[in-house]
Amino acid sequence: MTSRTRVTWPSPPRPLPVPAAAAVAFGAKGTDPAEARSSRGIEEAGPRAHGRAGREPERRRSRQQRRGGLQARRSTLLKTCARARATAPGAMKMVAPWTRFYSNSCCLCCHVRTGTILLGVWYLIINAVVLLILLSALADPDQYNFSSSELGGDFEFMDDANMCIAIAISLLMILICAMATYGAYKQRAAWIIPFFCYQIFDFALNMLVAITVLIYPNSIQEYIRQLPPNFPYRDDVMSVNPTCLVLIILLFISIILTFKGYLISCVWNCYRYINGRNSSDVLVYVTSNDTTVLLPPYDDATVNGAAKEPPPPYVSA
């Protein structure tokens, strides 16, 4: 009985890859260089593409974080600008103690600008009438000539030199009132300053009169005695008690000073209104370095720069 034994021959070894140059030398068809480069690029791009795909969520996350950071910085800058514009006028202006008395309205519920125009026109009319009277008196002295008996002794009413001075003062007052009216109408604050200075000077003179009456009450009696005998109500005033006369005169001067002070405040408020209207608003700009805002973080820039690798080198056949 014969037994069969199975003999297994070893498989032939796998042929080694022949280099392209040797294959061409022996007449075999070698691999195309372009195909070799493309296959090698695909083999090398496999891990690289896998790495890029793995880093894609991280890049997207960093891009979203960078975009969110830019939006947060932009909103912060806008809020800072708005807050600076809101607080800049109050912070840059010096608040004076008399600011609480500032108002845009005056008597008869009219605007301070309208009140200043009316006040300037009123003073202009009064000084024009005074100027006409003085000019007519200078042209015809006999019309305003008073005899010594009418004036009560050696009392000279007004000579030519005083008349010329009064005419010059009236002309100056007409010019000042016209400037104030024009400045209030055309909203030019500098034109109102001379009229305001005149009001301050007039107020100071009235204050000096009040102080003189308060310190020297007997001067009133002496002044009344110097008046002509035919002066209206001269004897009635002389018969009044000196103390009561002083109190009446002080009360009258106080009313005049209060009224003049109110007119001064109206003109001053008009000046402030026109000056504030013509002055440009203060703009506050919050500047920042735009390059630091727009540039990405350093880590993201280095990661993105490392991801962009150069293409594989060209291999000649």
UniProtKB/Swiss-Prot annotation:
PTM summary: Undergoes proteolytic cleavage following delivery to the lysosomes. Ubiquitinated by NEDD4.
Start-end of Basic and acidic residues biased regions: 32-59
Molecular function terms from GO: ceramide binding; kinase binding; phosphatidylinositol bisphosphate binding; ubiquitin protein ligase binding
Classification via InterPro entries: LAPTM4/5 (IPR004687), LAPTM_transporter (IPR051115)
Pfam families referenced in this protein's UniProt entry, alphabetically: Mtp
Region (Disordered): 25-73
Function noted in UniProt: Required for optimal lysosomal function. Blocks EGF-stimulated EGFR intraluminal sorting and degradation. Conversely by binding with the phosphatidylinositol 4,5-bisphosphate, regulates its PIP5K1C interaction, inhibits HGS ubiquitination and relieves LAPTM4B inhibition of EGFR degradation. Recruits SLC3A2 and SLC7A5 (the Leu transporter) to the lysosome, promoting entry of leucine and other essential amino acid (EAA) into the lysosome, stimulating activation of proton-transporting vacuolar (V)-ATPase protein pump (V-ATPase) and hence mTORC1 activation.
Subunit structure: Homooligomer; upon reaching the lysosomes. Interacts with MCOLN1. Interacts with NEDD4; may play a role in the lysosomal sorting of LAPTM4B; enhances HGS association with NEDD4; mediates inhibition of EGFR degradation. Interacts with PIP5K1C; promotes SNX5 association with LAPTM4B; kinase activity of PIP5K1C is required; interaction is regulated by phosphatidylinositol 4,5-bisphosphate generated by PIP5K1C. Interacts with HGS; promotes HGS ubiquitination. Interacts with SNX5.
Record protein name field: Lysosomal-associated transmembrane protein 4B
Organism listed in the record: Homo sapiens
Protein's gene: LAPTM4B
